[in-house]
Amino acid sequence: MKVRGTVVGEVTMRTVSTSAGERELAEVPVRLADGTTAADGSADGTATHDHDTDAATSTRSAVEADRPDVDATTVTLWGKWTESADVLEPGMELVVTEAERDEFRGETQYATTTDSYVVVEPSYLVDVTDVRNWVQCPRLYYLNKLSGVPLNYPVVTGTLVHEVFGDLLRGRDLDASIDERIEERALELGLLGESAESAAEDVRQNAAAIEGWLEQGRLSEEDDWRSEQLLISETFGLKGRADAIRRGAPVELKTGKNLRKEPRFKDKVQAALYALVLEEHGGSIDTGTLLYTKNSALDRNEETGDLTPAKDFSMGRGLLEYVLRLRNEIAAMEASGTVPTGKEADAKCEYCFERDTCMVVSGRLDQESKAGQVGQALPEAELDHFERFYRAIEEERREVHREYGKLWEQTPEERADDDRAIVDLEFVEARELDGGRWELRARRGSSGTAKFREGDLVLASDGEPVGGDAELARIERLDEDVVLTADEPVEVARIDIYPSELTTDRLLVALHDALLKGDERRKDILFERAEPEFESLDETFVGNNAAQDEAVRKAVGARDCALIHGPPGTGKTYTIARSVDAMVERGERILLSAFTNRAVDNALEALLDAGIDPDRIARVGTESGVRSDLQHLRLEREGDPDERVRALEDAQIVAATTATCGSRIMKEQSFDVALVDEAAQLTEPGTYAAINLAERFVLVGDHHQLPPVVQAENELVESLFERLVETYPDAGVMLDRQYRMNQRIQAFPSREFYDGRLRPATPAVASRTLDDLDGVSRSALPADRRDPVTFVDVPGDGERHTDAEEAARIADLIETYEAAGLDREDIGVIAPFRAQVSEIERRVPADVTVDTVDRFQGSSQEVIVVSFVASGDLDGPIFEDYRRINVGLTRPKRALVLVGDAEALESDPVYRRMLDWARS
Ligand SMILES: Nc1ncnc2c1ncn2[C@@H]1O[C@H](COP(=O)(O)OP(=O)(O)OP(=O)(O)O)[C@@H](O)[C@H]1O
């Protein structure tokens, strides 16, 4: 049976005499999660898919851990498992598989058996490659998290060899694969100063060994290969991508040589972890294979040793248990928030390539380390900042892991309802593409409103995203059909949101770079030790708008930073374009960034409108990320390395999302100034990713609109923009003339959110109404809809996340506006919950945009209808936070209709004032 629970007290270690001699044991007081005491019926004793344990097991709180352990049970861990007991602390979660139950002095107890596995913090999904680092030295694991994978030649060739390996498994020709893969990485090779020819030669040397080996057992039927498999383990708390699976067993590829008979230990560890996951999903693995690509390329006269590239090893039970204990050490360290010192392992610092980095990081962050420290520790405030944000980012990582957890905790229907999956796909075909990848096509059973977008990376599966045939795939098209591209021909029946840790990984690196590599002057600003300085400029940049003019002057003249606060429709994008134009004139190199691709593209469009030469611009992003009409600005990565690198380095303006700013390629670039739009939607470390690359920075945003998108409630919710606007009011300018809304529409948001400072930019803006639109006449509307702002009282139907009555009234309203001559494309409907969005979508024509506020930020419409879904006594603001309602109310240009239950809305002071305005 499987036992799962929370550790509620100190662990007792003992040695006892048994018939088999002296044995170690650890007694762990555990409060069992609901349902675990029931005898486990499943044959393999692992899967207890119990949804109810969620709340009890996923949140560890001090309160829980401190509760008197009246209902605690003793779980005894025998033998080597005492090593895992050693890392346990109260509050941590514990799982024992195949445990035995025992009655002892009238109490039920549990103990490990010879078939048991012990898992610490199973909901923390440790990455398999992280365990490989950890086994070399725990400190190496930590350093890798902080500094990420740099752009260097071994990393790039390693990736290329892996890609070619995958291609060979898919039956591609070696030369064709090498040529194509090298071409795809032209930009990276160019940045490293490598030629395509020499890189191809290096890859070929490595790949020849693989090819030779594959030839021997040539991809026969019974060999049953597949390349790259995403593996996730619910029981063992592991995830990773195995290089290949052959006859159900893991094969790992290592670019390098190994002349011993046995695989390297750390490589075995990695393969063994994949084997554990494969066993969980029903496999039975007795061997693992490591493939050392350099072995057969060696000159046989010079080297002696075992030259076979492929080395098999037997996957003993002892090894599997050992690697799981390693995994447990990582999970426990992350849960307790400690930093490894390197003393945990017996690695020799003298031989370590990372020794210098290790010493510098220890010195700067004042951490104990086996290698010793060099350099001066950061000031107290910076150390504190680092620790707080490190913890906050790790909390965010746990939220990502929780998303993984939902893959097995939720039923397919629940996931579909939550917009986390499309589950009713009917597989149509898998078509092989040039280059060995696959195009997968499936038909949708219903038109759900899942959050998926074209270009998203998703988990495509045969219906079982964990344990079944699943692969990462990219959405190429999404209408009544779903078209995906993937490495494997999965018979796709379902797609799920892929919980990526890339963002969290990059946040940590950005934090590290900002504090440890950051310019001192910038840190003085970030740590509020110095006032930002400005060069005084006499030029006029914008003749018809004083605030914009001042903003451009600040942006251009900033020696450290400038902050442009732009309420809705006040010409943020216009001001950015003017600023960039002026910076280009001065010969500066500019990084133009924003949280979303959409905002980056909007800014670029404005630059083109302002007459900036497109040849000066390089847009860094994927093909699906960049708007189709701006593809000509996109930096091509494929081709000739020299040409590609010149295209990037000669570009005076480089535009990319902040996430992309953290990529290996962008991290090699430097700029005079970084200009970041949507800065109020970025976390602090998210903003660092862009500003780390430049001498000075300009942040543009509005902290009264949407806050940073984060799952955890912690430091990350306040943007750097907001913090700096408050700290340095003199470095900021608020744009106060809006070019969007009729005066009536603007009145309430201006008063409520901008101290009444927002005004129409021109009389024409102030007086715009629907009558200005071709073929539209307000007189054709019912009298109570003619005002630019109106309210429709619909008593709520009592449901929490939907309101069918409101949805029906909205459908009627849309007909009314259409009858008055309005195009359906000019109407937008905003609802607070996805469920209500679906409810409304079912009733209105498809060309009316219906969405949540988050999707509307940054856009505008002629007419906006807001559905409030408010009922009862409003136990919290409906749009979660007033910033969301501000966004909702400021989208329309000419008409705004609020639909909701007046009585419920009036119970909240802000909504009451809103109703007073709408009804006045
Ligand atoms: N100084 C100006 N003179 C004339 N037109 C302007 C000026 N500033 C902005 N505009 C116009 O006002 C409109 C809104 O400007 P812009 O798109 O820059 O606003 P924004 O603040 O970026 O909007 P959002 O709040 O949606 O991000 C655009 O059509 C723009 O051309």
Each language-model region and where it sits:
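Accessory interdomain/linker segments of ATP-dependent helicases and helicase-like nucleic-acid enzymes
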Residues: M1-E22, R355-V466, P788, I814, ...
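OB-fold and OB-like beta-barrel modules that bind single-stranded nucleic acids
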Residues: K2-M13, V87-E103, T108-D115, D456-D462
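OB-fold (S1/OB) nucleic-acid-binding surfaces
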Residues: M13-G79
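Mg2+/Mn2+-dependent nuclease catalytic core
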Residues: G35-T37, A62-P90, D224-R325, T449-F452
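Nuclease catalytic cores
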Residues: Y124-D175, D179, V203, G375-Y390
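A non-catalytic, helix-rich entry segment at domain boundaries
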Residues: V164-R226, F389-E403, L407-I422, R437
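Pre-ATPase regulatory/linker segments immediately N-terminal to the P-loop/RecA-like helicase/translocase core
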Residues: S296-R317, E321-E329, E454-E550, V620, ...
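Conserved helicase motor core of SF1/SF2 NTP-dependent helicases
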Residues: R586-E588, A594-D601, A610, R644-V645, ...
